[in-house]
Amino acid sequence: MVSGSGICAKRVVVDGRHHMLGRLASNTAKELLNGQEVVVVRCEEICLSGGLVRQKMKYMRFLRKRMNTKPSHGPIHFRAPSKIFWRTVRGMIPHKTKRGAAALARLKVFEGIPPPYDKIKRMVIPDALKVLRLQSGHKYCLLGRLSSEVGWNHYDTIKELETKRKERSQVMYERKKQLNKLRTKAEKVAEERLGSQLDVLAPVKY
């Protein structure tokens, strides 16, 4: 990613699983403003500190905030985990300026890991990981679970799709492991067959 690491890939795919919501959002906002394209997947597994009941009460208070004369004017209350995360990032960006709007346009958010991002190497942000930032024994809840409690209807669907994706990934991993094993065996056989010829080739090999 741009800041700190000195690496600037065209697009960075971040796995949101077990990252703290606010810390992940602030790191993402900083990278977006620096010109980085960021894709965040598995938003339903982002963590919030505090138990589910407490977080649900806070969200229900937020749902009561509306414009009395015309509620459709706002504020808009998102239920999907990806949109909740997107709104959190938006609050950390000056999105009403051209620079902020351009930064927000560089962000993509998804529940689960849809193609083609299931074939791309995914990153984590250590500064935002639950295991490093939350004390052991501290209560937390998942954003997907909270969303399903306040009106998001696709929690089970995403769970089912993720199970299928993991099964496909496991099959591909086993196949790759088998191919690597066969390649190692073939190289060993070739070395035994060539024998002394390898000593002649050694000085000119890369």
Curated annotation (Swiss-Prot):
Transmembrane segments: none annotated. It comes from Arabidopsis thaliana (Mouse-ear cress). This is Large ribosomal subunit protein uL13x. One of its GO terms (molecular function) is structural constituent of ribosome. GO terms for biological process: translation. Pfam families: Ribosomal_L13 (PF00572). It comes from the Eukaryota. NCBIfam families: L13_A_E. PROSITE patterns: RIBOSOMAL_L13. Belongs to the universal ribosomal protein uL13 family. Keywords: Ribonucleoprotein, Ribosomal protein. The keyword Ribonucleoprotein applies. The gene is RPL13AC. InterPro entries: Ribosomal_uL13, Ribosomal_uL13_CS, Ribosomal_uL13_euk/arc, Ribosomal_uL13_sf. GO terms for cellular component: cytosol; cytosolic large ribosomal subunit.
